[in-house]
Amino acid sequence: LVLSIGSRLSIRQVGYNYKTWARAAFVIVNDIDCEELKKPSVHVDMAVHADAGDLLERLDGELDAIFAEEGEKLPESISRPGLKQLFEGGEGLPGMNWSETCRMWKETYPVVQPKHWASGEMEPANVYAAIEAISSRLKENQITVVGNGSACVVGGHGYVIKKGQRFITNSAVAAMGYDLPAAIGAWTASRENRFYSQGTDRGGEDLVLVTGDGSIQMNLQELQTIIHHKMGIKIFLINNGGYHSIRQTQKNFFGEPLIGIGVDSGDLSFPDMEKLAAAYGYPYVKAEHNRELAEAVEKTLNTEGPVICEIFVSMDQNFEPKSSAKRLPDGTLVSPPLEDMAPFLSDEEMDRNMIIPRIR
């Protein structure tokens, strides 16, 4: 069963070979835009044309009715002792249910790996190590907003999410420059909107923004808005020398010469962030190597008010795992199903991890 509520289910979410997405699942899709329910890139077994809030309220009422009628008969939750379990989860790999299978995958294929922390003393920091260093230090109920590129992709992959936290991303629905306005909006909402506070002490916590050196340039003027209103927004800036998503695409499909990337293409550059921070009145912190990450993160989080922490990361670290084209022996490029991601597993290992028949 796949239940999608208020999501566009864009190509970025279902994969380029979209006909293979959720091919063995019963798919329920809710959207307020009826045209989104008709697009050919998503197969829909049950379409629900409704406001997401109305649907969730109705579902909540149905669940309350089930618990009122059958609550005493329901088993205790394995993952949350003391609470009742309404749904045990579907079948997983042999001998496991779906939840157990997911836990096994997380342990077998961790996003942040020892190799990401193993860079040499003088090598640039690794973006996966940086994301882990930032997220592992945050408190419960804290809000994180991420921008585009590495912040969005690696943040979505490797962020350590704790109880009550919000992770706000624009993946597949917005352009570069989303970061600063989104952080300002989330900061304001967290102090004024009951849906963000939800009875927590969220209003007393600083907000974290993780963004990139390219994305932040698109709405740079909003740095003044943050300073002017003394918003407690901690800005972690991932500096990968340009537009890293475009860099990977060009390297994977075309090779050199690179065009419109950054320092390695030679035709594009960004201003010095330390000087910009000073111009806007921000305290500035930086980390250039993995060994400096912990101290830089600690100093940033302990600085009162808004602050910018620039982290200089390697330009050679690709996003992983990622949906990527495969090159066949005859040179043909094909888009594999979404579950078959780069770096690609061997045929034997893929077969061991499949619950439904595999598409080769």
Residue ranges and their predicted role:
Residues 100-200:
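Active-site diphosphate/adenylate-binding microenvironment
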Residues 48, 52, 56, 94-98, ...:
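Generic structural signal for well-ordered, non-membrane alpha-helical segments
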Residues 10-11, 123-126, 215-218:
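Active-site glycine- and acidic-residue-rich loops that bind
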